[in-house]
Swiss-Prot record:
GO molecular function: glutamate N-acetyltransferase activity; L-glutamate N-acetyltransferase activity
Catalytic activity: N(2)-acetyl-L-ornithine + L-glutamate = N-acetyl-L-glutamate + L-ornithine; L-glutamate + acetyl-CoA = N-acetyl-L-glutamate + CoA + H(+)
Taxonomic source organism: Clavispora lusitaniae (strain ATCC 42720)
Stated name of the protein: Arginine biosynthesis bifunctional protein ArgJ, mitochondrial
Active site per the UniProt annotation: 205 (nucleophile)
GO biological-process terms attached to the record: L-arginine biosynthetic process; ornithine biosynthetic process
Length: 413
């Protein structure tokens, strides 16, 4: 049997790109400002340098204890109408559950970033990640922001520094970039994310931001981001914990030209939404692959559910089942645990027809291994099941009797 050399590569060697394609009119970077131990990057910035007005959209945590930067950024986004020119992000300290002083610190980071970026008509957003309950070393951060502002650039190295500067328990920096064509124009998307623990649907210690030089209105971008996040960052699970700080931001400056995308009923809107959704799914998958203590990357796909909401609910229930995760970790083809989770998923009774439910293990290559077909158990080839389960990545297929599009959910065990 031939063994792939990739089995012996570290996660960083497998998943951190050596080059990329980056959107026009954005400068990024990362430095050490004194939050973490010496020489570890802990402050990142993104700035629109195109000379064109940029717009931003965001999706924030659903946790009731929203961190100070989440509250401040949501407030700024609403007041500015989405006219955002820059982002500032620190790692190593979450500035969460820090009271009024924490809010003051977050606002002072925004003010310092606005000054460094020379923002006048536009504003900055702020994000933080790290330990909860401690005040920021705000003096270090405020001293670092103007220094960082002078070191921004648009190269692959600058984007990598930016990705490194937002990491906490991550074992590798997470970044993705791509080019795509729309209406005869070529555009680029680039983004970074962090997260390895406290990851579950509705996001969790998870920060991410991405930029595009495509021309899109703020309302259209918000609609696209909400759609994309629901099908990416809100469809992943590692440990089922939800954080106080998670934030995903998208910013667009239209620097590559072309007609403005604003009408949701146009092919251009649908095409851009598809590009951003696929991009977000790729970035979110890196978070799952870096899950704390994780050994496998599993995609749970539900087909023919009664509705999109039901499919997502079933997939999420299976993904967060401790018994399912235990079985997968132990390479145990105990598909009864999958069926059990499907059965207690909080969907209406008519959504799951037990006589038309099928379950399969789906390898990345080769034919699916059928475990249950229309409610009837199959004779399972245990050796083939073990071969599939020992892989780093595979899928689980659940088919119901209704005719609907498939729904994917990513879990790590």
């Amino acid at each position: 049997m031939r063994i792939s050399p990739r089995l012996f590569l570290s996660k960083a060697e497998r998943f951190v790109p050596k080059s990329g394609v980056y959107p026009q009119g954005f400068a990024v970077g990362g430095i050490h400002c004194g939050i973490k131990k010496p020489d570890v990057l802990d402050l990142a910035m993104l700035q629109n340098t195109s000379g064109k007005d940029a717009v931003a959209a965001a999706v924030f945590t659903q946790n009731k204890f929203k961190a100070a930067p989440v509250q401040v950024s949501a407030e700024i986004l609403e007041k500015s109408g989405g006219a955002i020119n820059s982002l500032i992000v620190n790692s190593g300290n979450a500035n969460a559950v820090t009271g009024t002083k924490g809010l003051e610190d977050a606002r002072s980071m925004v003010a310092a970033t606005d000054e460094a970026a020379k923002n006048t008509k536009t504003a900055s957003l702020v994000m933080s990640t790290g330990v909860i309950g401690n005040r920021l070393p705000i003096g270090n951060i405020l001293s670092g922001i103007p220094v960082l502002g002078q070191q921004l650039g648009s190269t692959h190295a600058h984007w990598l520094q930016c990705a490194q500067a937002i990491c906490t328990t991550d074992s590798f920096p997470k970044m993705v970039s791509k080019q795509f064509s729309l209406n005869g124009n070529t555009y680029a998307l680039a983004g970074v994310a962090k997260g390895a623990g406290m990851i579950c649907p509705n996001m969790a210690t998870l920060l991410g931001f991405f930029a595009t030089d495509a021309p899109v209105s703020r309302s259209a971008l918000q609609s696209i981001l909400a759609f994309a996040v629901d099908r990416s960052f809100n469809s992943i699970s590692v440990d089922g914990d939800m954080s106080t700080n998670d934030t995903i931001v998208a910013i667009a400056n239209g620097a590559a030209g072309g007609p403005l995308i604003e009408n949701e009923d146009t092919p251009a809107f649908a095409a851009l939404r598809g590009e951003i959704t696929a991009f977000a799914q790729q970035l979110a998958s890196l978070v799952v692959r870096d899950g704390e203590g994780a050994t496998k990357f599993i995609t749970i796909r539900v087909v023919n559910a009664k509705s999109y909401a039901d499919a997502k609910c079933v997939a999420s229930t299976v993904a967060n089942s401790s018994l399912f995760k235990t079985a997968m970790f132990g390479n145990d083809a105990n598909w009864g645990r999958i069926l059990c989770a499907i059965g207690y998923a909080p969907v209406s009774g008519s959504s799951v027809d037990t006589t038309r439910t099928s379950v399969s293990f789906v390898p990345s290559e080769g034919e699916p291994l059928r475990l249950l077909v229309n409610g009837e158990p199959e004779t399972v080839d245990e050796n083939r099941a073990l071969e599939i389960l020992q892989k780093r990545g595979f899928g689980g297929g659940n088919r119901f009797g209704h005719r609907r599009k498939p729904r994917g959910h990513i879990s790590d065990v």
